[in-house]
Amino acid sequence: MKQKKKKFIPIKVKNLIEWNEPNGEGCIVSDKITVEGYKVGYMVRENPMSEYPDSGWRFMAGNEDDKYMSDPNHHNIFALNTICNYDPDIIPYLHAKTGSAFIRIDSQNFEKDDESKPIFIEKQDR
């Protein structure tokens, strides 16, 4: 079965960040953000995969269920700077330690996720 080509939301990529961490600037991003147009609602920094240029960051809208997330066709690898262009609200949090997780609490702000609050889910204004 031939895989259907994804239609990523077109954006003009500007250099918004300088990333000099040793593991690289790759990140895994849900299609809810890059294809369906949601803002980042949940972000977690895992241990980077050492065999790849991986920052450890994983970005989701926050409305993905387990079935959606278990399908690798629903996420892609991007450069951090590219995802910052999709959602610049994430920039202040990018140097957080491995193990950090943040949820969106309103249109522009995140806070550390202690699993006590719902994720604020919103579409990008494009």
Model-derived features: positions:
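Broad, structure-driven detector of short, well-ordered beta-strand segments within folded domains
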Residues: 40-45, 101-104
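Acidic, aromatic-enriched beta-alpha/helix-loop junctions
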Residues: 43-94
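A general structural signal for short secondary-structure junctions and capping/turn motifs
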Residues: 19, 31-35, 48-51, 93, ...
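Short, compact, well-ordered microdomains
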Residues: 77-123
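N-terminal low-complexity, intrinsically disordered segments
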Residues: 1-38
